[in-house]
């Protein structure tokens, strides 16, 4: 009991000192009792903001999440875009029912109307949403010695999900050499993005692959299982295809040469050049009698 009382007295002394220093520097004291708030989706959430040292406080709440910016409260009043979902009080703001889009950073800014005293504090709101079934992308067949990229993702989880991979029902470690079952594999696994890269692919990489998404809220969710075959490069097939192509190309060249040697191209040229057109001027006749005489001789 004595130790707890001593700790409580120390915290009170520090808080009082902070207020006095803030007043001396022209800066009000603003604090929150819960800097990180975690709430399941569709539940109410209270973001606390208490302040002192302001003669006529004006409170604003600003929202940021990545590139998104918003104003929740301005001059002690909830803005139009939030007025049906949020309530303002001297101790903070309260969401009636949060959605996943409400996840982000909320900054409580307090100032005097004259602007001489100012203070702020930031509260992080994390709306908890269970992960959905991950979408998996696994090639059905890859060539041994090449690079293969397997992906796994889901968009609903909040906070964002992390990913695990399973091969033939066994969890794949981050370091393949740490598990004898994967010691012959060479891969990198990114738990944040869900990307699994084999580089290079080996014969032992053939198997059934499954991905699992988890974000620490609700139960992990697994994807469908997809089979991948690691196959040898078909050198014989490539050689056969090249051989057939060369035969066809040779036959085409021979056909052109044969036609040329038999004079088929020359005959075609002569047949075109022998066609002549003879045109004879009409004889002079009377104005009342006109007749065009022309003949075409082929």
From Swiss-Prot:
Cytoplasmic side: 259-298
InterPro entries: F11R, Ig-like_dom, Ig-like_dom_sf, Ig-like_fold, Ig_sub, Ig_sub2, Ig_V-set
Signal sequence residues: 1-24
One record GO biological process: leukocyte cell-cell adhesion
Cell compartment(s), UniProt: Cell junction, Tight junction; Cell membrane
Topology of the protein relative to the lipid bilayer: Single-pass type I membrane protein
Residues modified by glycosylation: 184
Gene3D superfamilies noted in UniProt: Immunoglobulins
SUPFAM superfamilies tied to this protein: Immunoglobulin
Record topological domains on the Extracellular side: 25-237
MF annotations from Gene Ontology: integrin binding; PDZ domain binding; protein homodimerization activity
Predominant place of localization: other
Disulfide-bonded cysteines: 49-108, 152-211
Keywords assigned by UniProt, alphabetized: Cell junction, Cell membrane, Disulfide bond, Glycoprotein, Immunoglobulin domain, Membrane, Phosphoprotein, Repeat, Signal, Tight junction, Transmembrane, Transmembrane helix
GO CC annotations, alphabetized: bicellular tight junction; plasma membrane; protein-containing complex
Domain of life: Eukaryota
Residues modified as Phosphoserine: 280, 286
Role according to the record: Seems to play a role in epithelial tight junction formation. Appears early in primordial forms of cell junctions and recruits PARD3. The association of the PARD6-PARD3 complex may prevent the interaction of PARD3 with JAM1, thereby preventing tight junction assembly. Plays a role in regulating monocyte transmigration involved in integrity of epithelial barrier. Ligand for integrin alpha-L/beta-2 involved in memory T-cell and neutrophil transmigration. Involved in platelet activation.
PANTHER family reported in the protein's UniProt record: JUNCTIONAL ADHESION MOLECULE A
Annotated domain remarks: The Ig-like V-type 2 domain is necessary and sufficient for interaction with integrin alpha-L/beta-2.
Subunit organization: Interacts with the ninth PDZ domain of MPDZ. Interacts with the first PDZ domain of PARD3. The association between PARD3 and PARD6B probably disrupts this interaction. Interacts with ITGAL (via I-domain). Interacts with CD151.
Family the entry assigns: Belongs to the immunoglobulin superfamily.
Protein name: Junctional adhesion molecule A
Species the sequence originates in: Bos taurus (Bovine)
Lineage, top ranks: Eukaryota, Metazoa, Chordata, Craniata, Vertebrata
